[in-house]
Amino acid sequence: VLCGGRSTRLGSDKGLFAPLGDEPLFARALRLLGERFPELLLVVRNDEQAERYRQALQRIGDADFLARTRIVCDLDVDAEAPSAAIAGVRTALAEATHDTVIALPVDAIGVRAIHLSRLLVGAGNAIAACFGTVSELTAGLIPFPSLWRRPAIVSLANRVFRGSYGVRAALAELGAAAVDPGPFAAELDANSNTQSDLNAYFGEPLFDPFGRRLHYVRFSLTEACNMSCTYCLPEGFPEWYRHKARLSSAEVQTMLAGFRRLGFRKVRLTGGEPTVHPGCFDAVHTARRLGYEEIAITTNALLIGDVTRWLDAGLTQLNVSLDSLDPTAFKAITKNAQLERILGVIEQAIDLGIEVKINSVLLRSVNGTSEQIAAMIDWALARPVTLRFIELMPTKLNTSFAGGERVLGSELEPLLSQRGLERVNPRAGSPNLLGPSTNYSHSVLPGRIGLINPMSCNFCDRCNRLRITARGELKLCLFGDKDHSIDLASPETVAAHVRQLISTKPERHHLEDGNFGNVSTFRTIGG
């Protein structure tokens, strides 16, 4: 991440700029790079700037990021143009412990993880020294994001010595191969020249009365579902609830735009089963076009089909409901026998580089044995996925059932420690906390395990989300007593109405007191 460039309007420390209470630009860039890269370099101008970034990095407090991130100073700091991006690329190649480097400026606000994935896939095993991205605006190669290999370092050093600082010209001289960003080209042209540009792009942040930053909205597109999971409907779907509400595509688009004006950067589409809604796929595309950085869907995966089309539409995260790897237990819970189909979708998503999370609800009498749980854990640890065990939560229609079947997260901790898993600390200084899940990782194996314990360990203090029901109403708390109507006349009215209602968001739920709110079944809200 190139942090040392001068900017007449944002200054030389632009990477430390935090738009309207958000995280600094450099922290955002590191988050977008995510866990796919074993080494993260912040290339800065000099030792003084390095110290400022070092202090800011410590405030993030993520041990994993700290272990993988190094701050290095520009090798050409005494050159005539020490802030030239080409010098930063050369420095990265010289300092990196790996032979391949992806470079991007700290203020490249339009860059997404998908752009970096396409660069990596496009480069593959090709022998070219560098790869550039094609811009929709310029109809040619743009300097960043770009991929560079070690052999390019000699040419870059010579260009700096000659006073030739253009990265685009360096790409051309080295015969850079072009990588097409596909449907994501327009994002690369996002403007970040001024603080006004940045504030307009990121939106005006929303805080609740308890100081929690809200940046994540969950849309229940429909109450309809093509499964009948036991924990959702232990006695079947009641006759009085046969009508299955569904948001219209126009309502979804209006609300997506409204929440972007409030600085929301993550959206999740849920149900029921969201893919039974005819506008689900278009909603993903709309969210990408509006600038949401994280676009997720929680699904049983039966109707996903080819994951590639979802990736091209803008999907960045796939959450799959999978309660057992045992076909008999799976069918007993879901009333469905297509386990292999779901596993195939998961494997394809992994191959495509989409972030995959597996949601598993344990029932003591069905899939809650230590053998079944251990099998799920071992399967997940062997893959770059996060398997999250969710404590069965009570609703109006499953209270007695939940009490008898619930497996507490604390019961799983011995299985995790036996496999050498250690707890992952969240980034305490970042507004992008890890949410309700307490995560565990292994020092060698790629998978992670998460425990979501709403009953035994209240996580309301980390709440960063709002929910929209399939009836188009705002749910301020998953277990709140009231849903609120929203004025859907325009994105502006949506934003204004949500900002007005946020003052009534409660501090926490009261499940332990038997107050389950107005949720009848999880089919109506999607979790």
PLM features: residue spans?
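Nucleotide and nucleotide-moiety/phosphate-recognizing core
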Residues: 2-167, 172-189
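A short acidic, helix-capping loop that chelates divalent metal ions and anchors anionic groups
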Residues: 8-12, 138, 155, 187, ...
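Short, electropositive alpha-helical surface patch
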Residues: 52-77, 283-288, 367-386, 445-453
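Active-site oxyanion/phosphate-handling segment shared across diverse enzymes
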Residues: 151-203, 443-473, 480
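N-terminal [4Fe-4S]-dependent radical SAM core
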Residues: 203-218, 228-230, 261, 437-448, ...
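Canonical Radical SAM [4Fe-4S] cluster-binding loop centered on the CxxxCxxC motif
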Residues: 209-249, 262, 478
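Radical SAM/AdoMet-radical enzyme domain recognition
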Residues: 249-269, 273-390
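Accessory C-terminal segments flanking Radical SAM cores
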Residues: 396-516, 521-523
